Amino acid sequence: MQYFFYLCTRKRKILVFMKHIHLFLGILLALLPCQIFASIDMQAHVASDEGKQSYTTYLNKQKSYYTGVYAYDQLLAITGDELFGRLNQLMGNTCKLDAWNLDYGDLRYAYVDVDRDLNRSGYIIGYYDGKQLDGDWGSGWNREHTWPQSKGAKKEITMGHDMQSVRPTNTSVNSSRGNDAYGETGSYYDPNEISISNSAYKKINLGTYRGDAARVILYDYLVYGQAGSYKNSLYNGNAQLLSKLGTSGVFESIHVLLKWHMQDPPSLTEMVRNDGAQDYQGNRNPIIDYPELAIEIFSDYSKITCYPVTYNVAETVSPRYMHTLSDGFVTYLTNRDGSHPSQVSVTGGQYTYDASLGRLIITKVTGNLTISTSTPTIDVAVDVCAQARIYNVAGELVATTMDVHATLPQLRSGLYIISQGTQSRKVFVP
């Protein structure tokens, strides 16, 4: 039995962004070739975070972005300061906000492409609540600085008009956050408290925007932070981001960000939006493309303990996955007929399970984990240290434990995750 990913095919169009096009759209459409105004052709923009259970051809774009010294295998070979520096350099080389003369005002008319809702023409999806919003500027939404202007991300500087971190948001929702720091307790703003309000989508509240918010802040640090300072600034609080921690800052702690990042992994929404943001300004968010890189850069490995994880699948699979003592992970369980197990039991950890989604959240690891289900499943194995995963799309097994049993040329076109102990490899088969 083997598991594999498949790609949903879609066409891509080239976005040629023209500043202030809204003022002359009627005239220009009559005078210029329609190709000039080709917009981003994006896959369905879902408002729920159900993990990477399906992919679009965004992977083609992702693959071409990480090449040379920035190729995935090269990034995997380094950690910590060196990895931070490498990604910081990649962001500097590819971000074209200044080169393309894009500013804060341009965001108002780019969201209709980058954040558009394909279920309703001319509408966009609001950040934090998933609400359908009229894509025209002035229709009840504004621009949310996930890293507040009052705390450094002024709209006049590049960081303050970066498409990756400034999001279209329902005006009232934006006001409710204000400039509060992200966090879970006290006066912090917790994006987990916002419910999905778009009736066209399944309502999922658990961790809906926590992971999204964490990955934006980690992105901001990668692009605009200083190489070599992350440990001091995020752990000891005496360098680059000293003023950005706590209630008076931007986020509660790096521990909270990594927890949200691990327990609420990138959704299809984020993946597809990453394409649109790249079309707009040239660079991607590596933390969305390769979630494990955040752990390699920011995690304090002295706090990590190894536990074996056993699933009751058809073949006995008992790889050793690393888990922190305080944090868990999210995984998805699917039966071979496409349904989800009705019951799940776990020993060695605390957990919650949603049978309607097949989503199992291990909230705390206390010992050797054993995950059992009511029926044999196509399972998902998660490595919190490196975010290694075997996803549950129907198909053939790519790897078991340390051994690769599949011959890649025999596999269908798509992305495959090969998990090897605490390492994972993404292999794209064209």
Segments predicted by a language model, with ranges:
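Short, glycine-anchored, charge-dense loop/turn motifs used at functional sites
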Residues: 390-397, 416
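Domain-level detector of nuclease and nuclease-like folds
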Residues: 132, 136-310
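Bacterial N-terminal signal peptides
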Residues: 25-35
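N-terminal module-boundary/linker segments of secreted carbohydrate-active enzymes
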Residues: 37-130, 296-307
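C-terminal tail/sorting-segment detector
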Residues: 20, 376-378, 415-430
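Glycine-centered coil/turn sites that cap beta-strands in beta-rich domains
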Residues: 368-389, 403-410
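A glycine-anchored, Pro-Gly-centered beta-turn/N-cap motif
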Residues: 349, 412-415
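Secondary-structure capping and domain/repeat boundary segments
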Residues: 309-374
